[in-house]
Amino acid sequence: MAVQLKWPIIGVVIPCVLIAMVAYGSHYFVFRTNLSRTEQILYEVYVCIVWLSYYLAIVVDPGSPPKNFTPKAGEWRRWCKKCQNYKPERSHHCKTCNKCVLKMDHHCPWTYNCVGHNNLPHFLRFVFFLIVGMTYVLFQLGKQVLHYYDSSKLPSYLIDKKEMCAVIFLLPVTFFVFVSIIILFVRCMINLLFRGMTQIEVWEMERIGSQFHTERLWLQIRKNYFKLHGKEMPHLVSWNRTTRYYEVDENSNNDNSNENNIVPKDFTSDDIVFPYDLGVSSNMINACDYPWMWLLPWGGPRENGYHFQKNEFMEDDQLGLPWPPDGGHQEPMAPVDDDFDISDSELQDMPSLRRRLDPRNNMTRSEWMNDLGETLDDFGVDLDAEDIEHDDLVSKDEISNN
């Protein structure tokens, strides 16, 4: 995800070379003499399908907000300084494509395109078709390796040297590409199916989880709550008593019921509701259409990319704020004195101590990185286009007054 190329066109050239080398090299040197004519024709038809899916992943636009887009009540009013337009929920400005992208997942250097609302199905189909094709090639090359092993006692002149050299070269190359694609596909599908998130939203959730115990995060959330609901944030209570038991310091001298605490003591990061997770089936259908359309080139998302269906848990969400709840920015805090005492109780609770000492606690959204070292910049987000100082919530009172 963090790959950035000096010449972006190389990002398309490299996959084309690898696909052509594996697909046609395997056919010319190995399959031509080991598969029937029908099998070879079907194989080449499938290779054409892979090329078509890759072409669509490159050329299909991910989608951009309409001109003069107006956010609804309860949504973030986020202005793009470069597009001179408001951004819908889940949208970001891509620094490479130089435009706002609907439901931006990431900018993919290997397709020279953003993966977003409209072309995510094409991207997933390309990766899926590539995995199936690579699996078949690996299977056939593996059969040849077994054949060479069984023929190891035969005279060497009975073995096709060109074919053997091709197998020795193509097998590790194909395996390397296969493993790389599998990792990417599994990561995308886990986030899409089981969490309903884009790669950027997963990063945002990790950021909020990392800074969940900090006052600067909760000062901003309290400010946002008052802006949207017109009242102070109530006392928050966790739905997961087991998680709360382990996350809250048992030896804390603070009263958990004290609402004057800036950071809620009875609330955990698991209690933050991600509004767009509708369940495995609905997540896949909304992103890629019904199952019988998943492998077809015209299968696409069922939503418009401007407004998204929220899950039923939003009715029980104690914060009642749009995603992300801090709006992507937080209240500034005074510099923390590095020379502080650590109590015995803190030494006994190492996870809490590590969170407290994590240097990412006081990082801004543009600086923060996850455990893999990824920042928003690595996903292609143009932070210079964001007008954080003027981002605001659209309250119901504003809509009614207008």
Swiss-Prot record:
Q: Name one molecular function that GO assigns to this entry.
A: protein-cysteine S-palmitoyltransferase activity
Q: What is its main location?
A: endoplasmic reticulum
**Membrane-traversing stretches:** 9-29, 40-60, 126-146, 166-186
Q: Give a Pfam family name.
A: DHHC
List the stretches on the Cytoplasmic face of the membrane: 1-8, 61-125, 187-402
What is the annotated localization of this protein?
Endoplasmic reticulum membrane
Q: Which membrane topology term applies here?
A: Multi-pass membrane protein
Query: Which family is this protein grouped under?
Result: Belongs to the DHHC palmitoyltransferase family. PFA4 subfamily.
Full protein name: Palmitoyltransferase PFA4
Task: Supply the source organism for this entry.
Answer: Debaryomyces hansenii (strain ATCC 36239 / CBS 767 / BCRC 21394 / JCM 1990 / NBRC 0083 / IGC 2968)
Taxonomic lineage: Eukaryota, Fungi, Dikarya, Ascomycota, Saccharomycotina
